[in-house]
Amino acid sequence: MKRNPSSPLPLEGIRILELGMVYVLPLAIAPLAAMGADVVKIESEVRPEQTRWGPQPNNQQHEPAYNYGGSFHMLNRNKRGVTIDLSKPKGRDLFLRLVAVSDVVAENFTPRVLRNLGLTYDRLAEVNPRIILLSSTGFGQTGPWQNYRAYGPVTEAVDGLMELTGYADSPPQRGGSGGLGVTFPDVAGAYYGTFAILAALEQRERTGRGKWLDLSHYEAGVATIPEAVLDYTMNGHVQGRMANRHPWRAPQGAFPCSGPDRWIAVSVATDEQFVALASVLGMPELANDDRFATLRARHGCQDALDEFIAKATREWTAEELERTLQAAGVDAAVVANSRDVWMDPQLAHRGFFEMVPPPASAPDVGPRPFARPGWKISEASGATRLPAPDFGQHTREVLAEYLGLNGGELDAFVDDLAAEGVIADKPRKGMVARDPTDLPGMLEAGLLQEVDPDYRKRLNDHLAGRNAPLANW
């Protein structure tokens, strides 16, 4: 594909072959697709993308289930989908032909997989010396842990983050079970991968040769806790859990406001900010109390101080207190739930959410709002160009473009690959959609705050006038 120097999308013309499963690698490649790269997501009938099966829209099962998974649609917009079975010789040959005319290959298999397939970086570089290979794994391509299985909760534990998450008198907590709400090392690892690819593309402009990028989620996770690591290397301190508090700011925490489960986060860095906080909350005398007058004193009396603050914040709505404290120069923000985020006026002003049309196989779902990348490029709309692909939707199209085939030659080539089981238009039988989520059970367990029966109307009303209406909802 020829690059268009006048395109507002900086990666237009860059071809990326994504052998990505689940979350981290698809997330790493998503920003590159948004920046214009032609991303071809490769699956096979025996190894379809796991996120295809759920969660299903409106917590209802749809057919074909493998084209309806919400996570799949979030992570794979702006990508084209093909199927190639790499376990078959013809599949590997076909893959190498695509590598020969591509810029980047990204994969997140365990290290032994590509070795066993004979698709190492050295082999890819033989057919294309300019190819860049990103290998995204839990623990890297070398070392005693190289073939360990690693999902986010595993790396979250081993990289030290879990030990730092939670309350001092409670066991360690992982992000997805009461800490961060997401598996943070997954996100960090993903964007390290994005950055590495961009850096390798830039270097290739100078050297003319590709690179092998060996990404370890473990190492990316350790890099997210630099203060704790540095505290040990410099002082011998092994940090523990401090809940919402801070090593030197005080007060800091989440305080209750009026309304069910409404909270405000406050973080005070200076004595001047504390004077302002005490004044806004109607307790100016606290600033003259010897227990709270200085930062050092406040740090030693946080339990008592938190009680005073919590009693006062209950008289405010979170939104009004946020505005008032910010105007007074105090760091404060509403503790937003997912509905608050969708309804946020700042994000609405920025056009952060956009309506994305449904894939061809799922018209009954209708357009859905999705988050755009967290950046804007001048002269580029940032709008989604393609919905996430149906299974094998673009196989024929990509083979024609990348290999220069057409007409009868293309027909014969595709027919032969299909007959050999190299390509397919649906996953192998036996793979089914996830069961609908047990909403009552999740509510009872506290994993959901509530189920909003009017969520579609709320979103429709909020986005009306900014984006296309939510047709077919």
Predicted regions and their residues:
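N-terminal helix-loop segment corresponding to the beta1-alpha1 unit
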Residues: 1-206, 390, 397-473
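Aromatic-enriched alpha-helical interface/lid elements that frame and gate functional surfaces
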Residues: 251-332, 339
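Glycine-rich beta-alpha junction loops
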Residues: 46, 139-140, 217-222, 259, ...
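Short, well-ordered beta-strand elements within core beta-sheets of diverse protein domains
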Residues: 17-20, 83-84, 262-269, 306-316, ...
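Oxidoreductase and adenylate-handling cofactor-binding alpha/beta cores
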Residues: 167-169, 190-210, 223, 227-235, ...
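Short Gly/Pro-enriched turn/cap motifs at secondary-structure boundaries
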Residues: 63-64, 72, 239-247, 254, ...
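A glycine-rich dinucleotide-binding beta-alpha-beta segment and adjacent secondary-structure elements
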Residues: 328-385, 438-440
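Conserved Rossmann-fold dehydrogenase catalytic segment
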Residues: 141, 171-183, 205-221, 241-247, ...
